[in-house]
């Protein structure tokens, strides 16, 4: 019985892992190196990379040419 209790205690202690620091609105994880399927966009507080699935990274909008929009308004 004592052996079973000791085995259960050791198993529970080994099963606990340290919590992973999350970033990017809980969509990313702070790691030193990202997985192949992840990208990093910002750095975490611990200078680790914030590894995020690319589908959660915002796409930069394309800038429109300001000269063409000015020409169409100045022709009035």
UniProtKB/Swiss-Prot annotation:
It is found in: Secreted. Keywords: Antibiotic, Antimicrobial, Defensin, Disulfide bond, Secreted, Signal. One of its GO terms (biological process) is defense response to Gram-negative bacterium. Disulfide bonds join 23-50, 30-44, 34-51. Has antibacterial activity. Residues 1-15 form the signal peptide. This is Beta-defensin 121. One of its GO terms (cellular component) is extracellular region.
């Amino acid at each position: 019985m004592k052996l079973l209790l000791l085995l259960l205690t050791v198993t529970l202690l080994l099963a606990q892992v340290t919590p992973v620091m999350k970033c990017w609105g809980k969509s990313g994880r702070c790691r030193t190196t990202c997985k192949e399927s992840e990208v990093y966009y910002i750095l975490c507080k611990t200078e680790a990379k914030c590894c995020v699935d690319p589908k959660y990274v915002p796409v930069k909008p394309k800038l429109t040419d300001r000269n063409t929009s000015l020409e169409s308004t100045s022709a009035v």
